[in-house]
């Protein structure tokens, strides 16, 4: 059933904007890119705690963990650069692929870029599931990383451009919801396959990633391209036809004219990456980069990558480690649903600030428990304290899932102006994957050297990012994208200085630009 409504443009003209089934279905299908990403995040920690997997690819770690060799420290038994590379190589490949994905997103469209991501995922899954040596295993992870780079570039843009303004935040968070569902699915699979003997358990875990890979590929074939992308590539008749379909009305002429004007302004920018560095675009760039760095420095991916390994380090048995990872994965999914409901009601800042307090408290409590109860050679954490650690980790994961998880992607996608949005999204994904790689590659070594202090380290970052949000992050709830300059940046106590009138008339490629697109942007109307 469609929902009716109107969206108001910057010049006061109202455009009819219905929430049509095709929009909802397209957003759901596109968001399956997050399902694949989430499965890759969740599966690595589970298989790296499986004895058969360690024995085949990482015999040194296997001897320390399973055979009982090297009793030096519980915190250090998984400290192995090769093991960390298995996890982190995906994100380094994704970082590289993002540069190519920016080009394909702009020239081939969002839909075809998602299809390319699906193909990379399928080939990578096949190599991982059939891996005979470490080189083949890493090659598969690299191809999966290429898929991540293409999917993370195209999907958030697709969702922002096709979603109606009043539910833009909720629909955009479908991507993050699918990430959390993918993590939970991977944890459940790992819990089941860990009981399979003969070396097939880890192969099944890695091979079942083919399910979300196929969903993304089929979804990319079924969804409609955004009108923004079609007009941008000169396919005007198709763009108008799609606009009618996703609107559920023939009354699209005024809106289509606005879309043409927005596309014209965007095409005048010949060097979008260079334009990102111009003074009027610095606030959006700083916010986007900072959010990606802070998102990773919460420590969430370290926990999601290595949850079973982490629980094993803390003295949990093998089954208990995998089961605890399933519990945290379920909390992750449910809490993301909270974000979908609340992000367009209470706003972005409230969610981020509340979560900062909750994450800081949880990590400090975990650090205290581990500092007192877990030594280098202790074999088991008592049941009461083990439950408390799991509860605190779940409290921490819940806070992240309704704040920094989805909003780290949503806010950059809605704050960049149209003429620099593709480049801005590319920078956003690059920074995110770079710091994801750093954390994934360093976490087990940091755990070995910092011990319980690793949680103090991440809690300090949570404090810093909360202060940043309090003073420097403006609220963007229910504000059309093309009005961000006037209603957000020019009214902010700090960022307004970058929006001075004399900067509004800088020349961009021979044309005057006021740093604000008055044309139509699909993400604010559909």
Swiss-Prot record:
Gene Ontology process terms (BP): monosaccharide transmembrane transport; response to abscisic acid; response to salt stress; response to water deprivation
UniProt-annotated location(s): Cell membrane
UniProt keyword list: Cell membrane, Membrane, Sugar transport, Symport, Transmembrane, Transmembrane helix, Transport
GO terms under cellular component: plasma membrane; plasmodesma; plastid
UniProt topology in membrane: Multi-pass membrane protein
Chain segments annotated as coiled-coil in the UniProt record: none
CDD domains reported in the protein's UniProt record: MFS_STP (cd17361)
Transmembrane regions: 19-39, 82-102, 112-132, 142-162, 169-189, 204-224, 297-317, 320-340, 350-370, 384-404, 427-447, 452-472
Gene3D superfamilies attached to this UniProt entry: MFS general substrate transporter like domains
Extracellular compartment residues: 40-81, 133-141, 190-203, 318-319, 371-383, 448-451
Biological role stated in the UniProt entry: Mediates an active uptake of hexoses, probably by sugar/hydrogen symport.
Protein name, as recorded: Sugar transport protein 13
């Amino acid at each position: 059933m469609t929902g009716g409504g109107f969206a108001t443009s910057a010049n006061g003209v109202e455009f009819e904007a219905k929430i049509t089934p095709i929009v909802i279905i397209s957003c759901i299908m596109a968001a399956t890119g997050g399902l694949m990403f989430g499965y890759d995040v969740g599966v690595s920690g589970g298989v790296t705690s499986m004895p058969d997997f360690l024995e085949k690819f990482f015999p040194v770690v296997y001897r320390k963990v399973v055979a009982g060799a090297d009793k030096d420290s519980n915190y250090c038994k998984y400290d192995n650069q090769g093991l960390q590379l298995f996890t982190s190589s995906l994100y380094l490949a994704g970082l590289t692929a993002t540069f190519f994905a920016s080009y394909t997103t702009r020239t081939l469209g969002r839909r075809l870029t998602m299809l390319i991501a699906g193909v990379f995922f399928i080939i990578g899954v096949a190599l991982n599931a059939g891996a005979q040596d470490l080189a083949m295993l890493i090659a598969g992870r690299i191809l999966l990383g290429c898929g991540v780079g293409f999917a993370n570039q195209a999907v958030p843009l697709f969702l922002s451009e096709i979603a109606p303004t009043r539910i833009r935040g909720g629909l955009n968070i479908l991507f993050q919801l699918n990430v959390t569902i993918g993590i939970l699915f991977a944890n459940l699979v790992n819990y089941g396959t860990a009981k399979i003997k003969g070396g097939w358990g880890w192969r099944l875990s890695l091979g079942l990633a083919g399910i979300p890979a196929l969903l993304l590929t089929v979804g990319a074939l079924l969804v409609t391209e955004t009108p923004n992308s079609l007009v941008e590539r000169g396919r005007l008749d198709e763009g108008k036809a799609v606009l009618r379909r996703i609107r559920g009305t023939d009354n699209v002429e005024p809106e289509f004219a606005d879309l043409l004007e927005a596309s014209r302004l965007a095409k005048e920018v010949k060097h979008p990456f260079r334009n990102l560095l111009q003074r009027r675009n610095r606030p959006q760039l700083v916010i986007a980069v900072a959010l990606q760095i802070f998102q990773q420095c919460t420590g969430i991916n370290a926990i999601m990558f290595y949850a079973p390994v982490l629980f094993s380090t803390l003295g949990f048995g093998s089954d208990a480690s995998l089961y605890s990872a399933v519990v945290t994965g379920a909390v992750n999914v449910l809490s993301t649903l909270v974000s979908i409901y609340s992000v367009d009601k209470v706003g972005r800042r409230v969610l981020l600030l509340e979560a900062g307090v909750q994450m800081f408290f949880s990590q400090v409590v975990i650090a205290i428990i581990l500092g007192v109860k877990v030594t280098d050679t202790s074999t088991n954490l008592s049941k009461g304290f083990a439950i408390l650690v799991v509860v605190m980790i779940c409290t921490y994961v819940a806070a992240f899932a309704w704040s920094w998880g989805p909003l780290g992607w949503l806010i950059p996608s809605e704050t960049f102006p149209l003429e620099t949005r593709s480049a801005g999204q590319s920078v956003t994904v690059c920074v995110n994957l770079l710091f994801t790689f750093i954390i994934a590659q360093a976490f087990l070594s940091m755990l070995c050297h910092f011990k319980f202090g690793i949680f103090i380290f991440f809690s300090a970052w949570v404090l810093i990012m909360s202060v940043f949000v309090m003073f420097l992050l403006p609220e963007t709830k229910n504000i059309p994208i093309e009005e961000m300059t006037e209603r957000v940046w020019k009214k902010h106590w700090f960022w307004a200085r970058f929006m001075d009138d004399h900067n509004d008339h800088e020349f961009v490629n021979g044309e005057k630009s006021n740093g604000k697109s008055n044309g139509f942007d699909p993400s604010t109307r559909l």
